């Protein structure tokens, strides 16, 4: 008999939309609509290895001894009617704008069932037909780093338990995970980092 070893880390799996200016997902409304539909329809995978996330930053992480989740609350956006938001976001877009869109995930991540649920919800609610692409972890990491994806189901890690390291993965078009850029977000994160010395 052998036991399987499962390593746990401070990780949240999230949908990443490549939101560079040339991407169909440059529209914040479209990203929010698809994320809202996914959230409404996704169930925790049945493998028992995952739990539902209450926010991007996992429970239990601290900043200067203060639990981040207790202080920040639940920052998940409340999208009242993602279908209406989707219809509004689609104004002026053609179906051909979505050709070649794939949902990328690492092979052997245990999340194929979840990816199929999300993709099925987008098909049902939005008539969007994306393919699911599973690739080896090394290729997945390279494609995320280079921005060579349209949508990805990806692990967002707090290496060493650092909330700041986790949050710094967003907000910069050059070094961020999604191509999204917000100077105010980066300024606030920098101010907070300097105040805590992290």
Which ranges hold each PLM region?
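Structural transition elements
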Residues: 48-92, 109-113
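Alpha-helical secondary-structure segments
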Residues: 11-59, 99-109, 197-198
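Ligand/substrate-recognition segments at binding pockets and active sites
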Residues: 88-158
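Sec/Tat-exported extracytoplasmic proteins
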Residues: 7, 19-21, 37-49, 61, ...
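Ligand-binding "clamshell"
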Residues: 2-6, 146-148, 162-176
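Solvent-exposed, polar/charged alpha-helical surfaces in well-ordered, non-transmembrane soluble domains
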Residues: 15, 28, 32-36, 84-87, ...
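A structural signal for short loop-to-beta-strand junctions that line the ligand-binding cleft
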Residues: 2-11, 181
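Extracytoplasmic/peripheral linker and loop segments enriched in polar/acidic and small residues
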Residues: 44, 128-140, 165-198
């Amino acid at each position: 008999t052998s036991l399987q070893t499962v390593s746990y880390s401070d990780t949240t799996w999230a949908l990443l939309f490549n939101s560079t200016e040339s991407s169909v997902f440059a529209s914040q409304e479209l990203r929010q609509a698809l994320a809202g539909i996914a959230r409404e329809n996704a169930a925790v995978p049945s493998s028992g290895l995952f739990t539902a996330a209450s926010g991007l930053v996992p429970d239990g992480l601290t900043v200067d001894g203060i639990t981040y989740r207790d202080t920040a609350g639940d920052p998940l956006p409340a999208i009242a009617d993602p279908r209406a938001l989707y219809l509004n976001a689609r104004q002026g877009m053609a179906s051909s704008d979505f050709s070649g869109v794939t949902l990328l995930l690492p092979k052997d991540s245990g999340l194929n069932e979840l990816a199929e649920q999300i993709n099925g919800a987008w098909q049902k609610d939005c008539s969007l037909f994306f393919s699911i692409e599973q690739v080896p972890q090394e290729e997945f990491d390279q494609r995320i780093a280079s921005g060579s994806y349209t949508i990805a189901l990806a692990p967002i890690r707090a290496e060493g338990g650092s909330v700041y390291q986790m949050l710094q993965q967003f907000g910069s078009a050059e070094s961020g995970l999604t191509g999204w850029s917000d100077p105010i977000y980066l300024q606030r994160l920098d101010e907070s980092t300097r105040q805590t010395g992290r």
